[in-house]
A protein has these predicted regions:
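P-loop (Walker A) phosphate-binding loop of NTP-binding proteins
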Residues: 8
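ATP-binding Walker
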Residues: 11
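Hydrophobic/aromatic beta-strand patches that form the interior of the parallel beta-sheet core
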Residues: 3, 29, 90-92, 117-120, ...
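Small-molecule kinase domains that catalyze NTP-dependent phosphoryl transfer to phosphate-bearing small molecules
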Residues: 94-138
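Short hydrophobic/aromatic beta-strand immediately N-terminal to the Walker A/P-loop
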Residues: 2-4, 146
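Conserved substrate/cofactor phosphate-moiety recognition/catalytic segment
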Residues: 14-61
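Glycine-rich phosphate-binding loop used to anchor ATP phosphates in small-molecule kinases
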Residues: 45-99
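Nucleotidyltransferase catalytic core that binds NTPs
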Residues: 136-248
Length: 248
């Protein structure tokens, strides 16, 4: 997931990016910081602005390909720089001011034609809430149920457990224990397990966990640990048989 926030200098891009990245546990790439460090060899010619955008886009794609959500705040003033950056999953235009502090950027600025959110005022909290709700992003501060397992492979019994988990909270995290190769019962690497789950459970939030074997907690820690009883038919599902059927 790549979320790009564009707009003139001083329009509130970084403020919103900081708030949003914190709520969805994303990597935050600030274009000013990247320009001052990694891209310090670039100036402000049209060609260098396009190259700056291209490099930022490649950085965001690299991080996203590793399973990380990325929020990029970046002026991205022209159609050429936006094309060089690439199409994000979500584009947010902060249209809160008519002029920024840099005259050359004001002259370069071209009104965006493609965006998912268009904000004309400052309200990072309300805007973050709106983006998370409408784009169905996972809010790391919302009450969440944890569903922990190996899922070698994901099957009907796991789906039933997921439905029970959603009865507890509106948001569920499916945590996949990284047990690949630890036994003959664990032939699937994490990414294949995750892909299979996402194919079956379209809105699922799947994360990689260590090979958790024990859970220890203190008194009255603010959460519940419970075993969910499923029907005898679902409990009788054999993961070993499922693996045989799938040729694993």
């Amino acid at each position: 997931m790549i979320i790009q926030i564009i707009g003139l200098p001083g329009s509130g891009k970084t403020t919103l990016a900081t708030a949003l990245a914190d709520r969805i546990n994303a990597v935050h790439l600030n274009a000013d910081y990247v320009r001052a460090t990694i891209n310090s060899d670039l100036g402000f010619t049209p060609e260098d602005r396009v190259e700056h955008a291209r490099r930022l886009g490649e950085m965001a794609k690299m991080l996203s390909s590793q399973g990380l959500d990325v929020v990029v705040d970046f002026i991205c003033p022209t159609a050429a720089t936006r094309a060089a950056f690439g199409k994000p999953n979500i584009c947010i235009w902060m249209d809160t001011i008519t002029e920024g502090r840099f005259e050359d950027t004001n002259k370069l600025w071209e009104t965006p034609t493609e965006f998912d959110y268009h904000f004309v005022s400052y309200d990072s909290k309300g805007q973050t809430d709106l983006i998370i709700a409408q784009s169905e992003l996972h809010d790391w501060k919302a009450p969440t149920t944890l569903l922990l397992g190996r899922y070698q492979p994901w099957h009907e019994g796991h789906h039933a457990l997921l439905e029970k988990a959603y009865e507890r909270t509106e948001q569920v995290v499916i945590a996949v224990r990284d047990t690949h190769g630890t036994s003959e019962k664990d032939p699937l690497p994490y990414q294949e397990v995750a892909n299979r789950i996402r194919a079956e459970e379209r809105s699922s939030f799947v994360v990689k966990f260590p090979n958790i074997t024990n859970i220890v907690y203190g008194r009255d820690v603010g959460y519940k640990i419970e075993q969910v009883e499923l029907s005898q038919e679902l409990q009788s599902i054999s993961a070993t048989q499922k693996r045989k059927e799938l040729g694993l």
